[in-house]
From Swiss-Prot:
PANTHER family, sorted: UPF0319 PROTEIN YCCT
NCBIfam families: CrliSynInhib, PRK03641.1
InterPro entries linked to this entry: UPF0319
Signal peptide coordinates: 1-20
Keyword set, alphabetical order: Signal
One Pfam match: DUF2057
Protein name: UPF0319 protein YccT
Annotated family: Belongs to the UPF0319 family.
Gene that this sequence comes from: yccT
């Protein structure tokens, strides 16, 4: 099983389309959802960037940073989930620029009025729409895909309805089932399709790191 997955992932290294924009990841940003799809944290762990095509995009993320307290101690600050939408048309690189977040006062100010910039490769600000993702679920584990779908259907400041339509069900991710030798349970198919999706977005170094990790995993 492991060999089959690795072989499939190696095949995905072959170019299938031309990506035009590199999203540089920040160590202070925990990316949760990209364009309506949950981010594969295991695949992106340690990645410096992911590749995007030209056009509108939407990120859902939290800012996570160690801040200093008045008693000389430290704590991990975690922001509420934020939504930012932007367009990468004619842009080859996107970089995060966060405000100063070093102490409790600055963290509280950011909670009350989040603000940040996305910069292109020339350090020019990219027009963005930023909002807080209000979580409606009371479940212990939050399904961010569901929350983002609800948000995108509600005509909020940073909503992009086209991503709500894409995530109404997983039919787009399941459309490639026919390429498998046998039809496994839907949950397994969906997991594989999601893995393929994020593998294709990852930069070459991240792909290689993931493949090396996959080779070391025990066969099921």
């Amino acid at each position: 099983m492991k060999t089959g997955i690795v072989t499939t992932l190696i095949a995905l290294c072959l170019p299938v389309s031309v990506f035009a924009t590199t999203l540089r990841l920040s160590t202070d940003v925990d990316l949760l959802v990209l364009d309506g799809k949950k981010v594969s944290s295991s695949l992106l762990r340690g990645a410096d960037s992911i590749e995007l095509d030209n056009g509108p995009h939407q990120l859902v993320f939290r800012v996570e940073k160690t801040i200093h307290l008045s008693n000389s101690e430290e704590r991990l600050y975690i922001s509420p989930p934020l939504v930012v939408s932007f367009n990468t048309q004619l842009i080859n690189q996107v970089n995060f620029r966060l405000p100063r977040l070093e102490n409790e006062r600055e963290a509280n100010h950011f909670d009350a009025a989040p603000h940040l910039e996305l910069l292109d490769g020339d350090a020019t600000p990219i027009p963005v729409k930023l909002d807080i993702l209000a979580i409606t679920s009371t479940a212990k584990t939050i399904d961010y895909e569901v929350e983002v779908e609800r948000y995108n259907k509600s005509a909020k400041r940073a909503s992009l309805p086209q991503f709500a339509t894409m995530m109404a069900d997983d039919s787009t991710l399941l459309s490639g089932v026919s390429e498998l030798d046998a039809i496994p349970p839907q949950s397994q198919v969906l997991t594989e399709q999601r893995l393929k999706y994020w593998f294709k977005l990852a930069d070459p170094q991240t792909r290689n790191t993931f493949l090396q990790w996959a080779e070391k995993q025990p066969s099921s």
